[in-house]
Amino acid sequence: MLLVVFALILLGGWWYYDLQMAEIESLRVPGDAKADLEIAKMRLETVRATLTVAAGIGAASALVLSFRRQQHDEFHSTQQRITELRIQAVEQLSSDNATIRIGGLYNLERLGEQHEELRQLVLDEICSYLRRPFDLVTSPPADPEREVRAFAQEILQRRLKRRIGRRNYWSHNRLDLTDAALGVVDFSDCRLRNVNFTRVRFNGPAKFHGTSFEGPTSFTGVVFEQLVSFFDARFDDQVDFKEAAFSSVADLSRASFSGAAWFTKARFAHEVNCSLAEFREYLGFTGVAVDGYANCSGTVFHSYANFSKSVFAGGADFELARFAGVTIFEEVAFEAHADFETVSFGGWTSFARSTFRSSASFEHSVFKESTVFRESAWNWRASFLMVHFNATVDFEGSAFLDDVSLNGALLRQLLHDQSLPGRYRPVETSKGFRFLWTVKRDGSEPVVPQRRPGDAELQLRPGGPELRSGVESV
């Protein structure tokens, strides 16, 4: 520091002296003795002034350097004090006294509020506390630890709200709650980044209304003991619900999934509501068991959707859904009514080896690419009323044990006769192959829908599929 001050004095003094001497020399008049005397006096004054300026520069430099040293010392002192406070707060979290533990959480929150750069560390400490083993199921209601954990959750929920303003929102890079035991949770309207809820047990209702999940999100192996709602939630990256257990109603209505979503081997013990949800990337719903009613009406699947080997025990409603990519329902068991009415299948679709143990309806739906129902089993009524197959459809090896309705269905391309439900014959028209009758299981007279202008007049003889009248252009 002394060398810096000395260098500043020399440079400043030299610059000032050189500038003044140049101006004095410009006043010299050759042969004028009086002028020479005045110049000599001015040189002397310049020397004195230079020394004064140098001294001033030295004093100012010393003052600045002293101020910076003071700032440096104060910064280190503050950092040391912050470290001490953080250590003290963390130590309080290990106290046997619940009141002291709550005080430690309060002190951590205050540190994060006053020092923005510490907020991630504070969130890490709070998450670490919630990851400590604790059984909310077997612990008595009066256990003071319940109050401590509820306060820790409340800090997270309060500080991560989007609507509290930019200054009050705690920006973060991660939230790791792996194996945590949580009570009643409300992360509604929060913005959560890189959240890890792996194997978390939610022992109370969990609300994520309008929550924004940024970065990869994991709910792998999570257990929701009570109702959980992701209504209008936004997942900006991939999300993983593999082997998740939903013990009560699950609401994912209007949720938006911008990245891949995995629900592999998840278990829904009650109703699941995915109505009006949107899946923009791959959806893996394989090996899933839904014991209650599955409502996926109006849901949009922009990419590959795979429901293979899943079980829908309480009914499945996909009415008005839209599948834009490849859709797989292979080896799926529909134990109750399956509703696929007015559905748009935009890509290759397969229901191969699936079982419909109750009624199934695909009325007014559109299959834009090839469709496979090969080796499927239909135990009750199946309706394809007014369905449009814009490419080939394959029912080969399928078993229909009750009535099958293809009234008004339109098939653009014929794979081969054996690919259709038993006892049906395709009738070629100007627009494609039409089916305007219903075949009864017992071979009785079919029910023919009321003829509309342009429809073909087709009937079946009892006991056989032969035509009784000609075909008009359609």
Model regions: which residues?
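N-terminal leader/targeting and pre-domain segments
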Residues: 75, 83-92, 96-102, 106-109, ...
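Short alpha-helical segments used as structural interaction elements across diverse proteins
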Residues: 40, 45, 65-66, 98, ...
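Transmembrane signal-anchor/signal-peptide helices with a preference for the extracytoplasmic
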Residues: 18-19, 57-81
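Short hydrophobic membrane-inserting helices
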Residues: 1-58, 260
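Membrane-proximal helical linkers
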Residues: 26-40, 71-95
